[in-house]
């Protein structure tokens, strides 16, 4: 089976890219070959061409975001017309795919959420920005493609797709993210103490962990303000962002250098998960962050907003707390999680077992086979007329 997987910029640290890499690795045993179509990709062990994957470059031109967005879509259309694939799976908003995985959620919803927390001039720009208009226009066109199957990675995104674009539920398949549950393990208290000392942290203080790229969207600044009101907590911020310098400056301005560690991007987050006592991601919008799954597998209670796709499961299984995207609410949630850490830690580990990668891989393989069989049946039907 030959499939095309489309992701414009392939950053191995990104959640969507890690999902793609894991999916390809797990499906290679089923004789699935993937061609990844991308504008650019960072080189590492997982981005080299192998027997189960290769890379096709999409040429992008243009001087602004809107032009580049449209240019990428046109380049992909050309590539698809000159190559034969059994299935086309897109992680970008474009026309002509068989499957669109909503890993980035609904752009119209993101813009609406952003507008709510923005000053008036930003609200105005969000309405007229050519890039946002182009993306939302494409989303609307995709909703009218009868042969496009949507894959939502959370019930949050599934419902938003219905609410925003009236896509019938029959065209939406819910496949939540999967994770290798054996790759992340809980740490003993003794190990946590040892590792905290190695990082220069106080071994006696509870440690909150944040992992994510996109500090403003994922609530890193609000979390920092919450920690400022909790002198008995400490924080580790892991991830790359254009505002990395700004958040370091804010840590210094608040005089929190002794209890806040900003690491920048890390290819291996396991050492930080081993140190942490809980995980916090107070995002403005996050369809289904893989970092939360890694935290659950590490038996870390999680604190998230209701705009994070896994929030409903966290609440249902008492594996953490749902907070508002405000410092006071985050601080209160962290205190409650710490107070109930033993129970919530056990619940977090149990919840993680629902997201075993083998389960989601099988769901994807079933979907691929179903769609390919449907294509064959349609071709036979067309050939008889």
Question: Where on the chain are the PLM-derived regions?
Answer:
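Short acidic/histidine- and often glycine-rich active-site loop of Leloir-type glycosyltransferases
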Residues: 174, 294, 307-317, 321-322
